[in-house]
Design a protein with these regions (language model features):
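Generic cytosolic/nucleocytoplasmic N-terminal low-complexity/intrinsically disordered segments
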Residues: 1-2, 35, 113
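N-terminal targeting signals for export/organelle localization
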Residues: 1-30
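Short, functional N-terminal and low-complexity linear motifs
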Residues: 22, 39-44, 57, 73-79, ...
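Local sequence-structure signature of Cys/Sec-based thiol-disulfide redox active-site neighborhoods
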Residues: 34-54, 60
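Active-site-proximal beta-strand/loop segments in catalytic clefts of secreted hydrolases
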Residues: 42-44, 67-70, 101, 123-125
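Stable alpha-helical elements in mature extracytoplasmic
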Residues: 46, 53, 68-71, 103-107
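N-terminal, post-signal-peptide region of Sec/Tat-exported proteins
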Residues: 52-89, 93
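Thiol/selenol-based redox catalytic cores and closely related redox-interacting motifs
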Residues: 78, 84-157
């Protein structure tokens, strides 16, 4: 008869510990997402790899405001994306342009360092970049660019 109260107490303690752990993990994830800014992403409504890149951003704690539009060429021109750096989608975060399949870790670094540039770009659609998984991965570079279109290498993957 004494075994039952002990089991009930042990079970209750285990349940409380599990509940507290789950709450701590949720709070940690919420805190991470709350600290990262919203990225506005312009993309064509039918673009599948854009959806993959957006999922990558969300997985890494970003909140994303998606703007589906068939007018991507006009948007890139209006925002000032240099023509030689274009890809399939364009993002804006904290005043920086993010062109193409830029990894979330590079966006994190950009936002931490706050360089005086217009943005980051991964020209084209290299296999193996976020949103372009599958197939044989290619080496690619993340480039910085300024308003005149001058580029430098920010990261190599």
């Amino acid at each position: 008869m004494k075994k039952h109260p002990v089991r009930i107490i042990a079970l209750a303690v285990s349940f409380i510990a599990l509940a507290l752990t789950t709450a701590a993990v949720r709070t940690s994830r919420s805190d991470t997402a709350a600290k990262k800014p919203i990225i506005t992403v312009y993309k064509d409504p039918s673009c599948g790899c854009c959806k993959g890149w957006i999922e990558h951003l969300i997985k890494h704690g970003y909140r994303v405001d998606v703007k589906d539009t068939p007018e991507m060429t006009e948007i890139k021109h209006t925002l000032g994306v240099p023509s030689g750096l274009t890809a399939c989608h364009t993002g804006i975060v904290n005043g920086y342009l993010i062109e193409g399949h830029v990894p979330a870790a590079d966006i994190d670094r950009l936002l931490a360092q706050k360089p005086k540039i217009a943005g980051l770009a991964v020209p084209g659609m290299p296999m193996g970049s976020p949103g372009m998984e599958g197939g044989t991965p290619q080496r690619y570079q993340v480039l910085t660019f300024d308003k005149s279109g001058k580029t430098t290498v920010f990261a190599s993957h």
